[in-house]
UniProtKB/Swiss-Prot annotation:
Designated gene of the protein: CEL6B
UniProt cross-references to Pfam families, sorted A to Z: Glyco_hydro_6
Cellular component annotations (GO), alphabetically ordered: extracellular region
Protein name according to UniProt: 1,4-beta-D-glucan cellobiohydrolase CEL6B
Cellular compartments annotated: Secreted
Entry-listed glycosylation sites: 284, 298, 364
Principal subcellular localisation of the protein: secreted
Length: 419
């Protein structure tokens, strides 16, 4: 069965949407009293299930950049959930309207996927600084750097604006990575966790039979290596995208993946003439795998990487053998319900699915730094997988509603902390 996944098409991260207001809409504030009243009457209490047993935190890693920090809540994404909130209220679904309010307070990464979206970094920095000043709590801002030339070479749902045949590589370095790095470097009062180029290196491990991927090898390797060399600040923590367990977690693919990552770091060191650092690797970006599977799916039968925790543990020794850091962050922004997929290769707008466990450093795996939400739930994966799904990156309220309905209890169980 492992062989059948060697050419598995990945989950393509959707392009980020057009920026919106950085302030939460007034509707949320005005309706909060309605929800509190409903809670007081027992309308919500009966609906909230008993929370699962809390995971035990991993042994302390003082270098874990997420420990002691507050993950940045992206108001651009939170504002989009206002539509979902209103949809539930219109249907009289107070319980899920309440859950939506809590989801709006969860941290998500900010995607910078085009030259025109570089301003999102400025907006995130300004907002994080305000929150940090108001709360006195150190902010760690999650960003995604995603604009390689010939991007998304295997799936095509999130193809980018730069082409290697049209001076795309030079534009990537000068017009995208350079200002990106300058903006981040100037904000030394904040911490940053940056995910580098989702899906790209995974495609080089398994999809070189696709002409566009075969032609993108040096562009991908050198592009990511260049980004690494430009983001070597102490307050910046880099995570190279490592696909997910259903893609690179097979025994044959694990050493190949580690070799690919090592090659990129080698190129970064050669290009800069010095040793470059990364914190580790990001897994499950824009996919639907659980960190800790409650039910083992049949299609994972022959894989030791049957959830993302097992994938991280399986990949870690291969990384360490090559002198690479075995630290991970795992995207749990969307997790498929058990039985939602017939095959592991289903990646596009998978349903039923829900918001996964809320971001935390309690991961029950010593190589996993943190649970994070990288892919903003509710933004479409593309025109596939779900009836009438919009283009990649566009808001899909119907899909967002089922994410709320199936949300992990940790998303809303501590509601009283927000009032």
């Amino acid at each position: 069965m492992g062989e059948s996944f060697l050419l598995l098409q990945p989950a393509s991260p959707a392009l980020s949407p057009t920026p919106s207001s950085l302030l939460l809409g007034p509707t949320i504030t005005m309706r909060a009293d309605v929800l509190i009243a409903a809670l007081a009457t027992g309308a919500l209490v009966a609906a909230v299930p008993t929370s699962p047993k809390k995971p035990t935190p991993p042994k302390g890693d003082v270098s874990n950049p997420f420990v002691g920090k507050t993950q940045f809540v992206n108001p651009e994404w939170s504002n989009k959930l206002t539509q979902t909130y209103k949809s539930f209220l219109k249907k009289g679904d107070v319980k899920n309207a309440f859950r939506t309010l809590q989801a709006q307070k969860v941290s998500t990464f900010v995607w910078v996927s085009r030259l025109s979206e570089l301003s999102r970094i400025d907006e995130a920095i300004a907002t994080a600084r305000r929150v940090q000043k108001t709360t006195g709590k150190k902010q760690i801002v999650g960003l995604v750097l995603y604009n390689l030339p010939d991007r998304d070479c295997s799936a095509g749902e999130s193809a980018g604006e730069l082409l290697s045949g049209e001076n795309g590589f030079e534009r990537y370095k000068e017009e995208f990575v350079k200002p990106y790095a300058q903006k981040v470097a100037a904000a030394k009062d904040l911490e940053f966790a940056i995910v580098l180029e989702p899906d790209s290196l995974g495609n080089l491990v398994t999809n070189l039979n696709i002409p566009l991927c075969a032609g993108a090898v040096d562009t991908y390797r050198d592009g990511i290596a260049h980004a690494i060399t430009q983001l070597q600040q102490d307050h910046v923590h880099l995570y190279i995208d490592a696909a997910h367990g259903g893609w690179l977690g097979w025994n044959d693919n694990l050493p190949l993946a580690a070799d690919e990552f090592a090659e990129v770091l080698k190129r970064a060191d050669e290009a800069s003439g010095k040793k470059n650092k990364i914190r580790g690797f990001a897994t499950n970006v824009s996919n639907y795998n659980p960190l800790h599977a409650v039910v083992r799916e049949n299609y994972t039968e022959w894989s030791n990487s049957w959830d993302e925790s097992h994938y991280a543990s399986s990949l870690a020794p291969h990384l360490e053998e090559r002198g690479l850091p075995a630290h991970f962050i795992v995207d749990q922004g969307r997790v498929a319900n058990p039985g939602a997929r017939k095959e592991w290769g289903e990646w596009c707008n998978v349903a039923p699915s829900g918001f996964g466990p809320a971001p935390s450093t309690n991961t029950n795996n010593t190589v996993v730094d943190a649970i994070v939400w990288i892919k903003p739930g509710g933004e479409s994966d593309g025109e596939c997988g779900y009836f009438n799904a919009p283009r990649a990156g566009h808001w899909h309220d119907e899909f967002a509603q089922q994410l709320v309905q199936n949300a992990h209890p940790s998303v809303y169980e501590n509601w009283w902390k927000f009032w």
